[in-house]
């Protein structure tokens, strides 16, 4: 099949209407699907055949969104979920169980930080946070024999640090573990982590993918580039016989897509973090204009960052498109089309003065969100990262 550029794939990737089919994917608002042969149903439940039988596990509209995102990220398969947080949680649980360990950059979204610091340890999954700016040799000290994953964000929220993919790929290789990258703030238009060594990519589709603040959603894309068989002692759930499916072996049966299939028919089946068809439809509409929006968002953010950098009442500005940013060079390397639509800045006078600025806004909206076509503003320390201690806020890039 001919390869198209990413701008074309935003519109056409993952879905081509056949004769008589709708040009715009339809909403399959149904929980279940009719069959006329019991043997056909049995084959679906045994994973011998692909198809839809219950919308907790798969839905035609959601499936189109999954295929489109897999195409955009350059992976072998995608699985959608109800939110970005549900996606990250499910991704970790797909390879981790009681007694396991993961390593994560500390410069991550507050909800993810809390999930890793509070929720996972409550299930006896240990998380070690690292400073992603440390040397590779220093980062290696965090790796343990039971380390199952290395996690980071392409563009950290709200630290605005562009990930050094080369360094983190080497760290994951040292750990003999997959590199999981949250691509939310960049989107697959500005960066494709799999091309830079990531094995699994997650996105909160609620943000730039939807782009209009209308729907919740998350998506995991399996890069299909981690050899689970080579590390079978570490990842038995993907290699050894699965009790739920009468001894089926995911990697042996599904090859490069093993992680995605297990995620769907095991984790999504049991936890039910299912994306609604209506939300999938809205996210599909968002993808049609993703390339145009991300270009303009990046242009606008850079203009605002430059304006604020010269403003006498502004203490500092953090945006990887500025030459003053410590991530400027990494941004040029990994995000050449633009640095995204989010920036952070500090006003002189501290939090009290910041509150006054927020109260004086007219056009920009004070909301708990990024990724909207409308300009949004937020004070992370008192909102998205409020549950973190002051020390953890600093680690996460909140000033």
Where are these regions (language model features)?
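Short, acidic Gly/Pro/Ser/Thr-rich loop/turn segments
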Residues: 18, 34-38, 227-228, 290, ...
């Amino acid at each position: 099949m001919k390869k198209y550029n990413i701008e074309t794939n935003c519109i056409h990737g993952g879905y081509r209407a056949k004769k008589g089919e709708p040009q715009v994917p339809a909403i399959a608002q149904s929980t279940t699907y009719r069959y006329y042969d019991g043997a056909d149903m049995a084959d679906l439940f045994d994973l011998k055949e692909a198809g839809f039988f219950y919308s907790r596990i798969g839905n035609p509209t959601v499936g189109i969104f999954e295929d489109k995102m897999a195409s955009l990220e350059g992976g072998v398969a995608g699985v959608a979920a109800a939110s970005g947080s549900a996606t990250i949680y499910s991704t970790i649980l797909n390879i981790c169980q009681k007694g396991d360990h993961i390593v994560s950059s500390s410069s991550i979204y507050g909800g993810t930080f809390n999930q890793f610091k509070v929720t996972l340890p409550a299930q006896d999954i240990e998380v070690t946070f690292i400073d992603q700016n440390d040397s590779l040799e220093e980062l290696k000290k965090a790796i343990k024999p039971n380390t199952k994953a290395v996690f980071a964000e392409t563009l950290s929220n709200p630290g605005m640090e562009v990930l050094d993919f080369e360094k983190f790929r080497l760290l994951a290789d040292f750990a003999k573990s997959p590199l999981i990258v949250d691509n939310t703030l960049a989107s697959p238009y500005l960066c494709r982590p799999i091309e830079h060594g990531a094995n699994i990519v997650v996105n909160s589709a609620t943000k730039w993918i939807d782009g209009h603040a209308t729907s919740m959603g998350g998506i995991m894309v399996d890069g299909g580039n981690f050899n689970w068989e080579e590390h079978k002692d570490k990842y038995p759930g993907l290699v050894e016989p699965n009790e739920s499916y009468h001894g089926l072996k995911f990697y042996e049966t599904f090859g490069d897509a093993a992680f995605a299939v297990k995620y769907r028919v095991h984790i999504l089946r049991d936890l039910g973090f299912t994306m609604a068809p209506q939300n999938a439809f809205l996210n599909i509409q968002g993808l049609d204009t993703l390339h145009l929006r991300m270009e303009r968002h990046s242009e606008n953010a850079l203009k605002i960052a430059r304006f604020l950098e010269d403003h006498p009442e502004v203490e500092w500005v953090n945006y990887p498109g500025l030459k003053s940013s410590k991530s400027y060079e990494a941004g040029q390397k990994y995000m050449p089309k633009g640095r995204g639509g989010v920036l952070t800045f500090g006003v002189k006078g501290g939090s009290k003065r910041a509150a006054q600025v927020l109260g004086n806004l007219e056009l920009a909206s004070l909301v708990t969100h990024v990724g909207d076509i409308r300009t949004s503003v937020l004070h992370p320390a008192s909102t998205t990262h409020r549950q973190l201690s002051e020390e953890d806020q600093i680690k996460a890039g909140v000033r």
